[in-house]
């Protein structure tokens, strides 16, 4: 409970950033884009179909820049003051922490364990925390790893709090070199903790290779004869905190759950798992706030829970309207700078409107909001209004919305009325929790429709976020230093493509479902610029113009026709390209990144736009035609590994270190066909200029191709440089012959068409 005294300093402040210079640059680039479009229109008749195609592509790029400028116009973020929490709040609220995982092969259990351990060790009373791990793969290995981790947690959690460690994920902490006086108490504790962690790693690794090492425990009988897509509900209380006083030696609750799955029932992927987590946690601990963290995103800031509570516990009108607190999704991999930079600027921009978008991890939710509550149904003090009490708490309304479980309905009423949750014995709730995990429990209810995480999209985070903002809620954005959560991304190649395809498919799905920001035009509670922001992050459909624009310079060189204006008007194009390059480079350098990182990022987004995003459009078309159903593809996760030494103290080795670090791995997947085709076409066009393969004449008055088109071809090849290297590399870093053959056939066809058309 919080002290409402107004004389005390606030728990947080909202910081707005205004840069009139950047706004001027954004508008200047937008003006240059419109000038180029106007020039295209005025001289369209003289240049024919090529300029029409270029005009359509550039119109799309201009629209995207307009959306981006509108989104970034008023950046903001929230700065919490967790040090003030103790003097303002004498009884901190409980928090339920969710860690979903789906595949023990693609999401290694030791990585899940590290995420769980980092959450258990945060600076927050242990009796106020509960960690729930949802295993959609129903893997006995995941349960075994979690059980072994609970034993190590009794060593790790006190060690972290005793020495106030900054990094509380063991695998990251022990990657750092040991620095302490030999023989000191810290040195002895460090060595002992290191040895125990190595034992944990070996147990998990050995059990991964030999299932017999999982043991013959009666608890594992529940996993017999189970399949990932066909099994009953399994709920195990791995560790129950019975101390109840929250001292530094206590370990929070740890609960393993795996919902029932049957082949003939939809399980709605991650969104379905999150809703099951909400129901089970509601029955067991019913904390007023919920944190969801992906299994590869560990807590990197020990005060992260306290920082979020600063937002929720500030007694103000704004506090009552804050639905969730989002921390940015950041990564420890060097190959993810391209994502971090975009999210830094776009995240702060959206935060300055109605609040950040839920990105699916590192997000603290209010349970009442996830249960469908709207701001209009609250009094100024945060309690339910009389009208809401009659409508929401009616027995018929509760059963039709939340299901027929009486225990579930009771927990919902307590959550909506903000009643304190007593310390219950977790095992007493297992039977009721298993009931709400049945495949058909959500049938004829509002779960996934207006309650919990919303269905009908693979991007359940964005879908749910739009639903929350459409009800009039706001959200808060906190970007602490160091980052609150850190994770890993696929190192490159196929896995990165798969992940980007899933994200793109989900974001496009949102445009065509009931939560579409386009439909939000009829919802006054979703602000106009917030709708623009959602459109901006959903605009992966620009992949088709991106692909066409990468081929236009080559076509114009081979066809001997002009793509860019001539004379003084060429200055518009040159100034536009130069300003855009310098502007994006400045964004990178302001965040401390290098020119090389900027170049890699530009290359990455061009490759993704013409491959993963392109396939996502086909996914959506097939889904809309009813010819296919989208499948949630789990990308493979990796983590740094240690070089174990005899003493347990020694240098560590990352699995991505070495001469091949940063190289793209290729295989015969269709993901690599567009990029290979683009490189071959542009190389053929450049070679064609020197060997006289160009058409000898042109039919329009706009003139023939020239230096501008040749430079554009060179730029495209540079942006697709990983594919250029792949043409000459061998092994997994070389493009397979099957892909080269397909791309070569398409490239030859393109050249023949361009020259002969």
Curated annotation (Swiss-Prot):
One of its GO terms (cellular component) is Golgi membrane. It is an enzyme of class 2 (transferase). The keyword Repressor does not apply. It is a multi-pass membrane protein. Pfam families: Cellulose_synt (PF03552). The keyword Transmembrane applies. Expressed in young seedlings, primarily in the root vascular tissue. It is found in: Golgi apparatus membrane. Keywords: Cell wall biogenesis/degradation, Glycosyltransferase, Golgi apparatus, Membrane, Transferase, Transmembrane, Transmembrane helix. GO terms for biological process: cell wall organization; cellulose biosynthetic process. It comes from the Eukaryota. The active site is at 136, 461. Its main location: Golgi. The chain crosses the membrane at residues 24-44, 48-68, 533-555, 568-588, 607-627, 672-692, 704-724, 735-755. Its EC number is 2.4.1.-. InterPro entries: Cellulose_synth, Nucleotide-diphossugar_trans. GO terms for molecular function: cellulose synthase (UDP-forming) activity. Thought to be a Golgi-localized beta-glycan synthase that polymerize the backbones of noncellulosic polysaccharides (hemicelluloses) of plant cell wall. PANTHER family: X-BOX TRANSCRIPTION FACTOR-RELATED. Belongs to the glycosyltransferase 2 family. Plant cellulose synthase-like B subfamily. This is Cellulose synthase-like protein B2. It comes from Arabidopsis thaliana.
